[in-house]
């Protein structure tokens, strides 16, 4: 789910991140991006 995506995100400060994107899509969202080192899912 979405929360596990955030936990997983050791990602860059901004921008696209593959693992985060994949996780968000599995959670039913359109995409995932990084905001301040955290994964953010975009519905």
Curated annotation (Swiss-Prot):
Name the UniProt key words of this record, in alphabetical order.
Answer: Disulfide bond, Ion channel impairing toxin, Knottin, Neurotoxin, Potassium channel impairing toxin, Secreted, Toxin, Voltage-gated potassium channel impairing toxin
What Gene Ontology molecular-function terms does this entry list?
potassium channel inhibitor activity; toxin activity
Q: Would the keyword Disulfide bond turn up in this protein's UniProt record? A: yes
Q: Cellular location of this protein?
A: Secreted
Q: List the disulfide bonds.
A: 5-23, 11-34, 20-39, 24-41
Q: Which GO terms describe its cellular component?
A: extracellular region
Q: Report where it is expressed, by tissue.
A: Expressed by the venom gland.
PROSITE patterns named among the record's database cross-references: ERGTX (PS60026)
Pfam families, per database record? Toxin_17
- Domain comment, as recorded: The presence of a 'disulfide through disulfide knot' structurally defines this protein as a knottin. Has the CSalpha/beta fold, which comprises one or two short alpha helices connected to anti-parallel beta-sheets stabilized by three or four disulfide bonds.
The text of the family note is: Belongs to the ergtoxin family. Gamma-KTx 4 subfamily.
Name this protein carries in UniProt: Potassium channel toxin gamma-KTx 4.13
Give the source species: Centruroides noxius (Mexican scorpion)
């Amino acid at each position: 789910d979405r929360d596990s995506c955030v936990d997983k995100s050791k990602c860059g400060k901004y921008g696209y991140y593959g693992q985060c994107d994949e996780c968000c899509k599995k959670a039913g969202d359109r995409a995932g991006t990084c905001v301040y080192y955290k994964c953010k899912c975009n519905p």
